Amino acid sequence: STYIDTIPAQVSADGRLHAHFIQAGTTTGRFSSSNPNLQNIPIKSERGKNIRRAFIAPEGCMLVAFDYSQIELRVAALMSQDPYFIQVFKDGKDIHSAVAMKVFGVKEGEVTHDMRRRAKVINFGILYGMGVNALRQNLGTDRKEAQLFHDNYFAQFPTIASYLESIQNFAKEHGYTETLFGRKRYFPGIRSSVPFIRAMAERMAINAPIQGTATADIIKIGMKRAVDDLDKAGILGDVNLVLQVHDELVYEVKKEHVGEAIKIIENAMKHAIPSEFLANIEPVPLEVSVGEGANWGELKE
């Protein structure tokens, strides 16, 4: 009802929604959206898909969505320089299955759906500074097994362990963290005398460089590069960015320019990180999935 009841009343006379987007609307540096908040429309539920089907392209146009694939884990690989993670992404393999192989001690063909699901929880949990108790709850297991997964993860990926520790130590010493591009986020609570406030700040600090780099800095640089490249190609007026949802960019494209626009925007997003920030480190490929269709709820790759 949040969307079904309120969105129709917010449609302007031109048949469009003119939502507000705030460039620094979150502490991580990500965009936020309001009036209405189009970033919170569900995608996995059938109702969410039906709501998205109501967002249609004008006559003569298509909606084309570009979505970064596993961007936070790719950035984690880049910033930690973990050799296993980097190789998995270079080989084009699934990172959650690859981590499951290590954590559960199985071969590639032996990874079950449940193992991959658990590895995904562990991957994001560790990167978000999740402790053993939180892992236990999210995995639906007991503390002993959660502790085993936690310890095994750090034993298998010592480079990631040392990277996360260095981030936390830096934040404790300086009171802030930095993204790959040097954007700072301050954590006044990290020196608090109140234990739970200090612990919360430490958890947030662990993930801040990764999340800030991935879902804020890179997406914005990709957006700017796409605009510049579309302008150079002379089709900027026929390719309009209409929505940004975290890792996803949605464009309204004149049908005759869809193919060209996809190549330009996909390339801009894949090469969003300027080369000077990759000097002396092993790069990690950024991958983008593309879907197009007449409405936002039915986009085909």
Regions found by a protein language model. Give the residues of each.
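Conserved catalytic core of nucleotide polymerization and phosphodiester-bond processing enzymes
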Residues: S1-E301
